[in-house]
């Protein structure tokens, strides 16, 4: 068996022979990471990515200075989508070790689920994986309902049914109830709604290959809110929370939805489809209607919704939208506590009116006259939230997935957002 490479921390600069910008050095005892007090967690994560790039697959984090956040930063950079990596962790107190184990279980589940090929992860498989994860942490307090295929149409989940009907794999709505109170009439504190498009071809508004090749990850919002609920439970969540995952493929077939179709929703809204590649908002609408019907204090939806958010923020931040300044501030405070990147983008009342249609109340995409695509998408969703000005957060999760490796991340899913939402739920 190969001996593990020792990784130690130092606050002293590297030997001058390594250069004045060296973040790590190598000697007979292993590899030393040289912390300088300027973004030490980022330095550790970037160094871990380089260590993985050297082909070193077994490491031991040894010596002084390894707390849970530094351990986690190392793992975030070290983990990749190919191969097996082994880490011997330093001694941590019981609470920190339990927290680390929970992160390794749940956030790695999120990353691995998002990275899974679409052929292996259809709508029903995604819903079942979510159930399995939540049952693994709180099965006694979890009940759920899976509605799929024609049952969705019969129960008037028209957005989800319309988008998903073009695939041989039936669309699915997962409605899961985490109720630790033991009281079936307990109020619902929060609802989480996730976009679970397990593959997005764009439909008849078809994507180019360069934009389609990562679309197995278009269920990143659903995976992240599922992980967030599971992680919040491990941190002691004692309030009732409901989870709604809107899962479908968006494919082309003789039964696929078309431009000019009109979708009539249960809340009375009707929407003209002018871009089948703006499908995420169409499925989320059904989940948000259900969430609003619970009258919770808090609704959070999460979706890989727009290219516009990526244009604004790259893959480095999740985009946050809300009419509720106080709640948005709480989310950003949670993000800061968890060292996760969120950035608030504009959402104003006028964005709700920038989706005009000649044939319906709403259009599912903005015209060239209204180019703020991420904000108009959030405005669209607000029409399906009963009290949209209070208690609602929309997260356009640009940072869930990277098509190519960068200094601090391997290609693929990041798991970012799980801890922030869990923090907010348990605050």
From Swiss-Prot:
Binds 2 manganese ions per subunit. Disulfide bonds: none annotated. Pfam families: DUF3663, Peptidase_M17. GO terms for biological process: proteolysis. PROSITE patterns: CYTOSOL_AP. SUPFAM superfamilies: Zn-dependent exopeptidases. This is Peptidase B. It comes from Salmonella arizonae (strain ATCC BAA-731 / CDC346-86 / RSK2980). The gene is pepB.
């Amino acid at each position: 068996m190969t001996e593990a490479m020792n990784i130690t921390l130092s606050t002293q600069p590297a030997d001058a022979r390594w250069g004045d910008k060296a973040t790590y050095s190598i000697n007979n005892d292993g590899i030393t990471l040289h912390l300088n007090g300027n973004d030490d967690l980022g330095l550790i994560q970037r160094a871990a990515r380089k260590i993985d790039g050297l082909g070193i697959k077994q490491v031991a984090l040894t010596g002084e200075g390894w707390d849970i956040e530094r351990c986690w930063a190392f793992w975030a950079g070290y983990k990749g989508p190919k191969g097996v990596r082994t880490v011997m962790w330093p001694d941590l107190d019981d609470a920190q070790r339990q927290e680390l184990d929970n992160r390794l279980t749940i956030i790695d589940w999120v990353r691995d689920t998002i990275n899974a090929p679409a052929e292996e992860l259809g709508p029903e498989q995604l819903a079942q994986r979510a159930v399995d994860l939540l049952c693994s942490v709180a099965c006694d307090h979890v009940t759920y309902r899976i509605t799929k295929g024609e049952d969705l149409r019969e129960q008037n989940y028209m957005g989800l049914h319309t988008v998903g009907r073009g695939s041989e794999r039936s669309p699915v709505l997962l409605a899961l109830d985490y109720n630790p109170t033991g009281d079936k009439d307990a109020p619902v504190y929060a609802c989480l709604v996730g976009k679970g498009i397990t593959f997005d071809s764009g439909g008849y508004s078809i994507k180019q290959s360069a934009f389609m090749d990562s679309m197995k990850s278009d269920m990143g919002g659903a995976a992240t809110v599922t992980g967030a609920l599971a992680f919040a439970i491990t941190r002691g969540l004692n309030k009732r929370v409901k989870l709604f995952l809107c899962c479908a493929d968006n494919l082309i077939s003789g039964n696929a939805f078309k431009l000019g179709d009109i979708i009539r929703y249960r809340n009375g809204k009707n929407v003209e489809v002018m871009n089948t590649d703006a499908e995420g908002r169409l499925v989320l609408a059904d989940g948000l209607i259900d969430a609003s019907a619970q009258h919770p204090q808090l609704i959070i939806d999460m979706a890989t919704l727009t290219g516009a958010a990526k244009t604004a923020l790259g893959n480095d931040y999740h985009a946050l939208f809300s009419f509720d300044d106080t709640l948005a501030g709480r989310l950003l405070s949670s993000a800061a506590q968890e060292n996760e990147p969120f950035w608030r983008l504009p959402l104003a009342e006028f964005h709700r009116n920038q989706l005009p249609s000649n044939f319906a109340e709403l259009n599912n995409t903005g015209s060239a006259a209204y180019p703020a695509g991420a904000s108009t998408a959030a405005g669209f969703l607000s029409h399906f939230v009963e009290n949209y000005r209070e208690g609602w957060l929309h997260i356009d999760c640009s940072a869930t997935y990277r098509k190519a490796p960068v200094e601090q991340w391997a290609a693929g899913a990041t798991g970012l957002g799980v801890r922030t939402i869990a923090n907010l739920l348990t605050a």
